[in-house]
């Protein structure tokens, strides 16, 4: 998938430069919507059909969006460029890279929190606050429940992993005892 990331990067960077001139959050929403629409098998089928013109494919993509930016000239040009260059399948990766650029600009990061039990409200807020102090940046949490952890949490921020789960501790003890 590194190849897709390499091809998608210039598109994400160009779109981010355009977004810097306006509302980055609105552009982020637009590119996320485009990525979701582009993953639909029906859309990919229509996009690869020789019976449908490139202009029609671009119009179809834009018509499926809720974002108010979809009617703007810049969004239309971006989508038309992707269609003309047969890069619709790159939209999910473009969205990932756009979000990474947005987070870098905001000094933020996405955090994946996997817990043995559901985390909500004050408990989640307290955990996120302590993680923000540890990682020294604003974090945007995505919480997942995995009962196989037995207890504790596993936190992933970028390429850093903090695993305080009971399962990880047991695995560590097992490794120490069998070594």
Curated annotation (Swiss-Prot):
Membrane spanning stretches: none
Cellular component aspect of the GO annotation: plasma membrane; proton-transporting ATP synthase complex
NCBIfam families: ATP_synt_delta (TIGR01145), PRK05758.2-2 (NF004402)
Name of encoding gene: atpH
Subunit-structure text: F-type ATPases have 2 components, F(1) - the catalytic core - and F(0) - the membrane proton channel. F(1) has five subunits: alpha(3), beta(3), gamma(1), delta(1), epsilon(1). F(0) has three main subunits: a(1), b(2) and c(10-14). The alpha and beta chains form an alternating ring which encloses part of the gamma chain. F(1) is attached to F(0) by a central stalk formed by the gamma and epsilon chains, while a peripheral stalk is formed by the delta and b chains.
The keyword Thylakoid belongs to this UniProt entry's keyword annotation: no
Disulphide bond pairs: none
Descriptive protein name: ATP synthase subunit delta
One matching Pfam family: OSCP
InterPro entries: ATP_synth_OSCP/delta_N_sf, ATPase_OSCP/dsu
Membrane topology: Peripheral membrane protein
Record function comment: F(1)F(0) ATP synthase produces ATP from ADP in the presence of a proton or sodium gradient. F-type ATPases consist of two structural domains, F(1) containing the extramembraneous catalytic core and F(0) containing the membrane proton channel, linked together by a central stalk and a peripheral stalk. During catalysis, ATP synthesis in the catalytic domain of F(1) is coupled via a rotary mechanism of the central stalk subunits to proton translocation. This protein is part of the stalk that links CF(0) to CF(1). It either transmits conformational changes from CF(0) to CF(1) or is implicated in proton conduction.
UniProt-recorded Gene Ontology molecular function terms: proton-transporting ATP synthase activity, rotational mechanism
Cited SUPFAM superfamilies: N-terminal domain of the delta subunit of the F1F0-ATP synthase (SSF47928)
Gene3D superfamilies: N-terminal domain of the delta subunit of the F1F0-ATP synthase
Stretch forming the signal peptide: none
Organism: Burkholderia mallei (strain ATCC 23344)
Superkingdom: Bacteria
Subcellular locations according to the entry: Cell inner membrane
Key words of the record: ATP synthesis, Cell inner membrane, Cell membrane, CF(1), Hydrogen ion transport, Ion transport, Membrane, Transport
Family to which this protein belongs: Belongs to the ATPase delta chain family.
């Amino acid at each position: 998938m590194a190849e897709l990331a390499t091809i998608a990067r210039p598109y994400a960077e160009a779109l981010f430069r355009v977004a810097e001139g306006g509302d980055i959050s609105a552009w982020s929403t637009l590119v996320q919507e485009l990525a979701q629409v582009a993953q639909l098998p029906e859309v990919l089928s229509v996009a690869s059909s020789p019976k449908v013109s490139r202009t029609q494919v671009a119009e179809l993509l834009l018509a499926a969006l809720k974002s108010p930016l979809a009617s703007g000239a810049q969004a239309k040009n971006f989508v038309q460029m992707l269609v003309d260059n047969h890069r619709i399948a790159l939209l999910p990766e473009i969205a990932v890279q756009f979000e990474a650029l947005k987070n870098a600009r905001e000094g933020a990061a996405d955090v994946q929190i996997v817990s043995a039990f559901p985390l909500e409200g004050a408990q989640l807020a307290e955990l996120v606050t302590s993680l923000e102090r540890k990682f020294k940046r604003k974090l945007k949490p995505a919480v997942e429940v995995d009962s196989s952890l037995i207890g504790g949490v596993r936190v992933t921020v970028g390429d850093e992993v903090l695993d305080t789960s009971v399962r990880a501790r047991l695995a560590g003890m097992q490794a120490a005892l069998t070594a």
